[in-house]
Amino acid sequence: VVTSMGGLPRNIRMAKAPPIKCQGIKTKLVPFIFRNIRWNESKGGRWIEPFLGSGVVVLNLAPERALLTDTNQHIIHFYQAIQQGEMTPAAVREYLFHAGRQLEQQGENYYYEVRDRFNRTGSPFDFLFLNRACFNGLMRFNQNGEFNVPFCRKPHRFTPAYITKITNQISWVSCQMRGKEWEFRVASWEEALRVASPDDFVYLDPPYIGRHTDYYNHWDMNDTLRLAQAMRQLPCGYALSMWLENRYRRNGLIDMLWDDLELRVYRHFYHIGATEELRNWMLEALLIRPGFAVPIHAQAELGSHRQSHQLSLL
């Protein structure tokens, strides 16, 4: 994976996964995103993500300068802890080894003990543990802002190999950040857009309307309309990820709000059950400000690529 080429576009075969998981994570879409966006990083601008989520896009891009915001303070504090050297690979390995052993011995009782502790203290180590030990890797908070996802029922989850995998992800994140001017900030998307300058590039990955929302991820039509209006005021390039179509319906918002943007489409499949018959397709849209999209014919220079991939939603 190329980590620094002066912006975009670039060709990568496969993106690396971050240490935390969340719904709608874009790991498999990163190569598609990188092929289609044009951004000249050498002008000194920042890569801005107002909806950081898992951080998978910026971590694979590894720009020199970035503003990374989210309303979920736990995501921001997690990456700040890595950036500031609190969560080193060695510290994470030691923590997960101990926590994994306790989970084996006490089962779900230990999981809920950690969950209660996290909801009191907000420890980034506990956040990582819960994210990897909870049901389906969900990240969900109740109306009081408390993590409320149940246990995954796998007390032997933290095997030596699994701990090594997570530790390596922490090491990779630390490496991608090192020497970079990245600002992680707990902030609304409005605050992030407000400080954008002409040489920046804004990548937007808002929650989907209709998908489960929680304390940190409430999103409705009014939010979408406000975002669409705010995007028009940006002084720089931007791109928006949004679902376009599945076998049941098409997202009418794209034609209604963003028909003037460059549209790039990625087709993938996901399973909703154990059999082949339950495999569904989905079209994902990348909507790019005119002048900042890589022409389709120019993408051949970046290398051939498959148009359809198997994609896990988690």
Regions found by a protein language model. Give the residues of each.
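Conserved S-adenosyl-L-methionine
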Residues: N36, K43-G100
